Amino acid sequence: MKVNKESMLVYAITDRHWTGEKTLEQQVDEVLKNGATFLQIREKNMPHDELVKEAVLIKEIAKKYNVPVVIDDDIYAVIESGVDGVHIGQKDMDYIEARKLLGDDKIIGMTAPSVELAKKAEKLGADYIGAGAVFNTSTKKDTKYAPAIRHQPKRYLVSEKSIFNLREDYYSRFFQEK
């Protein structure tokens, strides 16, 4: 499954620490049932073998909704679980090596927190580009968010492959014209 404009409308990212009483699978099913069109499994502290098992279960749930699934950082978990692709950051495996391992049929998304890095990611062939956090976030302590993007978002949209991580309560403020 490849990325298209429709699949990038609502990009959901997992974090099992926020699921409350529900299992990760229950939470994923609910999110996809309610309209998420793309899913990233981002479980930073989950052991590799457990991540692969979770990814296999989540892949089956996503298949019901025809939603692509990528795993954050762990290319080998992608290969072992058979999910649709990987999302890599600037400090992860480089794009060329990732593409060699995954082949042309898998999705590779990249984080690019600047216009320069986004253009580089697009030139390399990334299927989509994430700008990262545009506001401070409690879910990613080491983030260097990009406040300039929130003041002129249209200026920073390098291409239709660009995405931003926005909480719902920030969305309307973010896209208001200045």
What are these regions (language model features)?
Residues 1-93, 100-127, 172:
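Conserved N-terminal beta1-alpha1 strand-loop-helix module at the mouth
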